[in-house]
Amino acid sequence: IDPRKSEPAAIPNIHLPVRPGTDALLIKAMISIIIEIPGETKAYITPNVEGWEKTTPWYENFEAKAAQAVCELDYDQVLELCRLMTTKKWCMHPDLGIYMGRKSVLNSYMMNILGAICGVFCVSGGNVIPGMVVPMGFHADERDPKTWKTVATNMPPAAAGSFPPAVMPEEILSNHPERIRAVHVSACNPLRAYPDTTAYEEAFSQLGLLVVNDIVLSETARLAHYVLPCRTFYESWDTTFFPWTFPKVFFQLRRPIVTPPEKCLEASQIFTLVADKLGLIPDIPEDLYEAAKADRLTYGAKLMEWAATEPGALKAMPFVLAKTLGKEWDSAAKAGLWGVAMTAPKAFRKNAARIGFE
């Protein structure tokens, strides 16, 4: 399903060149078609899905044929695809067109419903839910009054502790006394990557301070008050966040292969310097710096000994690792990953044992 006849779109049995921006309408129409097909997988829904009876009315009596006309697709072809999806094994792979297009959150939500009603999650030949080394963030409960929300749009950090970027221009341009006045952008280009780029351009032009660390002078960087050049991914220690290697498990820490220009730092080193100047890092004793030059066991013991007596140590631990171990390794990111490995939960050890690590 792609508006463009891309290289992958030239291969398959079915290519649906959906009209750009109508993905959500197409998915809703497909769900409405499938719930009317006798082959809908109730045997899967009953033991695995909660709240289905509340969800079904959203898709009943929907004019799927008219929707396909808006999507500029052949209804019979979509109908045939839906029939196949209820009778065959299949899996789906959404990518940037879904994630960065219109109604991206709705797209992702309805794709999960589409997969659920066809029973493709966690089954042979369907979609797997891969594991992780550590979560990149934690979902917030918007019902908890202690959950901090954006001041202008009242949005919670629902997705892995992150706020939806689409609300950012409004948060900057509002007259609220606690509105966003300064932004630090790291390795992304909001003025071109996030929804409503015109609103972003207006909002970022009103900021009192815009700082960008990146490997390129992007549109956002050109608007910034300060640009802090980063090392490229060939010049720094980095990890692979999206390995397509299932069922084999890989977590790759890649070593730098190119010498960076003088004074050019990793993004993690830049954040450590900023945190230090802001006074967020407690004073670190000299013997901890010395221990970082020794073996990891010596360093780890000294680190825990100091952390037990320093109240602010645990909260600032990534920066402490960066200033000590990261100084020796010339990589705050690599030092941070060492800390993650040392504090890995039991589930991590269990999974590591499954693939051969003692």
Each model region followed by its residue ranges:
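Short, conserved secondary-structure transition motifs
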Residues: 135-140, 221
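Surface-exposed loop and adjacent secondary-structure segments within mature catalytic domains
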Residues: 15, 143-146
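Cofactor-pocket helix-loop regions in the catalytic cores of large enzyme subunits
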Residues: 1-123, 128, 132, 153-356
